[in-house]
Amino acid sequence: MAKAKFERNKPHVNVGTIGHVDHGKTTLTAAIATVAAKTFGGEAKDYAAIDSAPEEKARGITINTSHIEYDTADRHYAHVDCPGHADYVKNMITGAAQMDGAILVVSATDGPMPQTREHILLSRQVGVPYIMVFMNKCDMVDDEELLELVEMEVRELLSDYDFPGDDTPIIKGSALEALNGKDGKYGEPAVIELLQTLDTYIPEPERDIDKPFLMPIEDVFSISGRGTVVTGRVESGIVKVGDEIEIVGIRDTQKTTCTGVEMFRKLLDEGRAGENCGVLLRGTKREDVQRGQVLAKPGSITPHTKFDAEVYVLSKEEGGRHTPFLNGYRPQFYFRTTDVTGAISLQEGTEMVMPGDNVEMSVELIHPIAMDKGLRFAIREGGRTVGAGVVANVKD
């Protein structure tokens, strides 16, 4: 049989299931795959295939995740589901599976539980922009008032973490009934409603190429008679010959102009998101630029030394530290292409951080780095990774 050609004609959106253990995330993931395949075509993965999440490495950290894909009438979705709570924490902090929106699964029989809260907090910290809710196991609750109570609790919890709790879509259903092909209101119709809500509630994500130009600098060369060339992979946007650009981070921000773009020794008119290229800078001296800075569209990103972060500390089994660290700990923070030393302050009431924990902290770097909320980094000690983090807030 001929292999189906992957068609890129629908917008691509990344989503995932979050929520407390045993509330039905994996069953719902399997039900979505099954119902989507039945309704909109495509191939369904069964529960066992999703549950046996393969290991993958992200920034040197082992994470178990399942990836499935499905289509609706208007979109193509990539959906991530994690088996264990620790996998969620690692996944969200490292950004291994970036989510344009999340489906929070809450069991109607339990209501919100500790990990429900923690996953909402994590979503807020790492910048998941939209959360919608699937209230699962509704077939096991006879009392309509109980369902309303759970819904109210979920809305309040979302509002506590600055999500629009009152306006969040909440779909009531039973993932198991839907998976078994039942067509009562909690079965397949509930999952079809969920798919329609995904299409309407999560806006189409902005593509990297449409964002402002940004290129982390990896290397700097001087070419006699032509000037200084910096190389790197364009992270977002487009740079054209003649564009004004800024060099941001580590030192004072400098303005310069792109006088040439080259790729594989060929001269081009522009460099685009995803491409590795060299950018020729007008009037910039070799010693004025260094690895760890970024080239950016003027005014689009600013340098900061202080920020708040959500951090996952590797366990010793993952090659991390064997001992906890305390307030004032000074490791290296690896942003994009370079290490910068920084000092950490833990939140009041937190004395120390154990390997394997995730924690909120404030950091002060010795040099400013071009950063925005959502930027990922690694924490290193003597060249080995001991933690992974994400900028939750920039200060100054």
From Swiss-Prot:
Residues binding GTP: 19-26, 81-85, 136-139
Region annotation G2: where it falls in the sequence: 60-64
Subcellular location: Cytoplasm
PROSITE patterns, sorted: G_TR_1 (PS00301), G_TR_2 (PS51722)
Region (G4): 136-139
Region of interest called G5, as start-end residue ranges on this chain: 174-176
Keyword vocabulary terms for this entry: Cytoplasm, Elongation factor, GTP-binding, Hydrolase, Magnesium, Metal-binding, Nucleotide-binding, Protein biosynthesis
Gene Ontology cellular component annotations, sorted alphabetically: cytosol
Keyword set includes Magnesium: yes
Coiled coil feature spans: none
Residue sites binding Mg(2+) per the record: T26
GO MF, one annotated term: GTP binding
Residue ranges of the region described as G3: 81-84
Keyword Repeat: no
Enzyme Commission number(s) from the entry: 3.6.5.3
Protein family according to the UniProt entry: Belongs to the TRAFAC class translation factor GTPase superfamily. Classic translation factor GTPase family. EF-Tu/EF-1A subfamily.
Function in brief: GTP hydrolase that promotes the GTP-dependent binding of aminoacyl-tRNA to the A-site of ribosomes during protein biosynthesis.
Subunit structure, interactors included: Monomer.
Entry-linked NCBIfam families: EF-Tu, PRK00049.1, PRK12735.1, PRK12736.1, small_GTP
Designated name of the protein: Elongation factor Tu 1
Organism: Psychrobacter sp. (strain PRwf-1)
